Amino acid sequence: MDASGYDGASFIPEFYDHVVPYASRQDVAFYVEAACQSGGPVLELGCGTGRVLVPTARAGIEIVGLDASEGMLEACRRRLRAEPLDVQRRATVQRGDMRDFELGRAFRLVTIPFRPFQHLVTVPEQLACLSAVRRHLERDGRLVFDIFNPSIHRLAKPADGDETDEEPPFTLPDGRAVIRRHRFLERDLIKQVNTSELVYYVTHPDGRQERLVHRLQMRCIFRFEAEHLLARAGFTVEHVYADFSRAPYGSQYPGELIFVARLVAPVQEFGG
């Protein structure tokens, strides 16, 4: 199963950049600054529609984007085609699996913005991704990524399948009005995996209505669990932040979990 569910929900690339919580995220400046500090080149895993990739290229940094969804990549290419030629030349995108890829070059920085790492729902998958990252980093290169900080109180709630209406509606350029709701189908507390659905209620300009469903899985990863994964893969954690203004971890709860990790040495591969 593709835990992100993007290729099973072909409408997502068209909707993605208009979803209010996505469009209003405060992470773009954080990742662009990290890219500029590295000097590039940068590899972004899970680049999606280019929400972070294009601003990074605008800032003068060479960046390569990798994504498993051809639909998301085509949306990214369309966004790039609207940019000046110098921006287009600094950005390259290609389809690939973040668990197993070989690009034949090294990068100063690898980023994984907005939680695609959590679509890796087993430890072997997580370690495979970190191993691939390690192979593509220059000596002393850095990995920067964010995940959500699991809320113990939320995890304790049963997955009742009820839809919640927590988000502002949005309108697509063609006039379709969209309301998105969320529901949890299953919480596997042993595997730390949530299975949920994002349900889109679409009203067309002619009044016709449509219900579209995006099913996905995400693994909850706690702070020290992530730090052990990184250490096992040959990284040392330099910073852990609670938000994209670099507030220290623990200053808010649940907040974000944002890691800056440095490659320290090649390590022996272990099984999962």
Show where each model-derived region lies.
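Conserved class I S-adenosyl-L-methionine
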Residues: 1-48
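A short glycine-rich, Lys/Arg-flanked "PGG" loop and its adjoining helix->strand segment in the class I
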Residues: 127-139
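Conserved SAM/SAH-binding loop-helix junction
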Residues: 51
